[in-house]
UniProtKB/Swiss-Prot annotation:
Protein source organism: Methylomonas aminofaciens
Role noted for this protein: Transaldolase is important for the balance of metabolites in the pentose-phosphate pathway.
Keyword Chloroplast: no
Protein name as it appears in the record: Transaldolase
Keywords: Cytoplasm, Pentose shunt, Schiff base, Transferase
Location of the protein in the cell: Cytoplasm
Superkingdom, taxonomy of origin: Bacteria
Annotated GO MF terms: transaldolase activity
Amino acid sequence: MANLFDQLKEFTTIVADTGDVEAIKSVKPYDATTNPSLLLKASTLPQYAPLIDEAIAYAKSQSGDKAQQIEDAADKLAVLIGQEILKHIPGKISTEVDARLSFDTDAMVQKGRKLIKLYADAGISKDRVLIKLASTWEGIKAGEILEKEGINCNLTLLFSFAQARACAEAGVFLISPFVGRILDWYKAKTGENYTSETDPGVLSVRKIYAYYKEHGYKTVVMGASFRNTGEITALAGCDRLTVSPNLLERAEGYRRYLPRVLVDNGATKQRPALLTEKEFRFDQNEDAMATEKLAEGIRGFVVDQNKLEKALAEKL
């Protein structure tokens, strides 16, 4: 019998959640995603030293201002790592916008355009890149603007139904609801152990998937942040799942039959009126888990962005 990975590929697109090219070569995913934490980790790998040198040289050629050089080097490095990954996958790479911009729509739009231009300068068309944005109200609005310019977006750090609904209504290409981090929060709060069928993260993605399909939204649902293979099997049939290399490797040993769980039965319901900003903010605030995990996620990415920039600054 085929392993979990091979069975899952029959009805779900598998995406590698890593910046490590060697891991990508090994698991052969369709797409790949990166974020500041993964880029920081990747930047310590010896095979990336030439890319760091190239990013530094690029930054020095663009500006004499140290702060601008640091920003340019970080952006260039993200794109260089993305370029390297694209050599080994047939699909798209997700490259994240600086999390410090998460509450500034205009700044996120400008950064998204800049990243796409850096890819274009390297001969990579925008249809192979997803710009990752935090699913704040401002991030969702930035995604809406970029999508209208033909720049596809991946709205990440998504923990609530309000975020998912606003993303669909904005017409973004893809969302990344975080399964494992939702589970983490509930386990910490309740002290309970959850099965894959009672896992709050799994149930959240199932609800979002069903809502999108029955209302005819085209936004792709890509489950993310998995803690175990049970969460993955419980979401078999989801549009896409982005999985870390270690979980993908574990899936190699799974030899049981994998049934499809999520099924698209077509649009059957009329779409509601668009969610207003006031409604979004209230609904998000009512969800303590989503409020805490979104804030925590942004802070975590900012910490790693700062660490990456500090390491780059030492080389400038």
